[in-house]
Amino acid sequence: MKKLTIGLIGNPNSGKTTLFNQLTGARQRVGNWAGVTVERKEGQFATTDHQVTLVDLPGTYSLTTISSQTSLDEQIACHYILSGDADLLINVVDASNLERNLYLTLQLLELGIPCIVALNMLDIAEKQQVRIDVDALSTRLGCPVVPLVSTRGRGIEALKLAIDRHNANDNVELVHYAQPLLREAGFLADAMAQEMPLQQRRWLGLQMLEGDIYSRAYAGEAAQNLDTSLARLKDEMDDPALHIADARYQCIAAICDVVSNTLTAEPSRFTRAVDKIILNRFLGLPIFLFVMYLMFLLAINIGGALQPLFDAGSVAIFIHGIQWIGYTLHFPDWLTIFLAQGLGGGINTVLPLVPQIGMMYLFLSFLEDSGYMARAAFVMDRLMQALGLPGKSFVPLIVGFGCNVPSVMGARTLDAPRERLMTIMMAPFMSCGARLAIFAVFAAAFFGQNGALAVFSLYVLGIVMAVLTGLMLKHTIMRGEASPFVMELPVYHVPHIKSLIIQTWQRLKGFVLRAGKVIIIVSIFLSAFNSFSLSGKIVDNINDSALASVSRVITPVFKPIGVHEDNWQATVGLFTGAMAKEVVVGTLNTLYTAENIQDEAFNPADFHLGDELLGAVDDTWQSLKDTFSLSVLANPIEASKGDGEMATGAMGVMDQKFGSAAAAYSYLIFVLLYVPCISVMGAIARESSRGWMGFSILWGLNIAYSLATLFYQVTSFSQHPTYSLICILAVIVFNVVVLSLLRRARSRVDIELLATRKNVSSCCSGTAGNCH
């Protein structure tokens, strides 16, 4: 079979991702475009005659980049197409918005690269009474047009057949430009490298006249002639870019008049009716908060019901199984404990997180595909404008509920460097899925019937602190107003199940692999460090270990937030949590249960793997049956506790060490707000600079320590009024000093602000193929 590379390109919300998932299934690979942290997805699929590599390009409305401060999506899409790597392009077009989508189509066809138009969302178009003559559209465009409903898989085989039959586009002169424009485009084309096809050279000439800044990198000596061409055009027309765009829109209008009835189409009545409620200025925000609470509720309920299968199953295989192997093969006791507690305990920490994190990713994917996520940005626009940000900046922040890394990377969709940087600084405060795992454990141990409210309050607190961080930046070092916010609101539709599953699987797989590697390594390290004293001797009591000795020296620093000296395990959890937040659970689980593992004698004669796995299945089935009872729906956290006794095990030790719910909640505030994990730090450094990464770390530590101290000292004021008063005053004075210093630093920071993405944008200013 012949190999074929195809670029998949289209407007945002045109169904491009759904089509990509339909064609490639699970055969996908996610990486980054060279030099930037913009996600690059590739997938594999086969037709009758070809083995195809499909490259999913960023969604874009146009290939024209007017400013270096614009979104990176247009830059990457344009440079990939011009690199010549793609043998064929599939342009996904939203049939219900034909006129707007055809602007990108015309640019692709003018470039002369073989192209297939995938006319998607025909079901939505039909509901809006839109009729399109597909054959007439194909004739007018001079390329194949394949009707699709990608959410249902309709038209996929026809698309594969069109790929096998692909040829060069018919040489149809689509757009009739003014003669002066053609003359100057030809003049510029003659000065370009003759190895490039004439059609592409003329296209580059028009792009240069339109003001596209990156086409000059491909124009060679022609770039030096641009000023001459513009000077000649100035005598004949006011604005060449306006004339070029007008000629394209006239062509689009002429095509639509012939092939469709878009002028008489009816907007979706369902979408209009729902938007009257969802976008209501008074109801919009409460509805958004309810949706976020519902996401948390489902993650805890359904994810918690599936947890016994992953928890008890991993204990049976990776802890008891390792102990049985060690006993059978006569391993030394210290080695068996080390492997069971380190390797087995690490795996046992990761796997129980899978169902709850997976349910949250599934819910987020549903919100994105259904069309609600765009509405959430619109609802938050008024609040974001108060911060000097457009509502569009809230979209990457919402993504932060899943993971802060794509949240930071999502800031690239914003146009102004100031807006990107402010969004990046706010992103780490959004409570990610790994933090949910920590909150759920503490809620079950300390808050009982109020567990759901406690966890939800932490989510809201994260949003509030992100907003306050934005206000602080706006009034100190990043003053300015938001750019105008224009955003397309797609019609509501039922997401495709296959697409939801694939998106959830990709995110969950990334989480498990990333978290698993870190947790297992940390668990093994902690197990070793917890088995020896500072003098190198093996210890029987973990309180005599080197880890305990070092941690006790550091723990007094956290006394103001409620971490007592004997609770050195909590201090270790904070340090390991800087690598990955989910490691906090693994650390506490390893340390709080270490004595139990050392003290409990293992009898290999009593170990039966099959019985333990069957027990895990039975517990899971019982949990699923109980999941939707009224008591569980009203109390998801309490239900997730299961049948475990608080007096024993990790939860019992943790309850004794913290001593009160106030101390535990204060600890959770610190975990929510302090330094982001290593992956997020790296993303911040790549998207901005190491300096801004350092600022984010220091600001997060200050906010976390200050807020946790204020909460704990206020709630426990009656126990030690003098100490509490000193702590509260110290926090207030310190933050007043910090804010005054930031206000004074504004003039110096403004100069450096515009350069924060210079290293990122420059990747697209080189020669062809530099962005792939």
Curated annotation (Swiss-Prot):
GTP 2 binds at residues 35-39. Signal peptide: none annotated. The keyword Iron applies. CDD domains: FeoB (cd01879). Residues 3-169 form the FeoB-type G domain. It is found in: Cell inner membrane. One of its GO terms (cellular component) is plasma membrane. It is a multi-pass membrane protein. Its main location: membrane. InterPro entries: Fe2_transport_prot-B (IPR003373), Fe2_transport_prot_B_C (IPR011640), FeoB_Cyto (IPR041069), FeoB_GTPase (IPR050860), G_FEOB_dom (IPR030389), Gate_dom (IPR011642), P-loop_NTPase (IPR027417), Small_GTP-bd (IPR005225). PANTHER family: FE(2+) TRANSPORTER FEOB, FERROUS IRON TRANSPORT PROTEIN B. Belongs to the TRAFAC class TrmE-Era-EngA-EngB-Septin-like GTPase superfamily. FeoB GTPase (TC 9.A.8) family. This is Fe(2+) transporter FeoB. It comes from Salmonella choleraesuis (strain SC-B67).
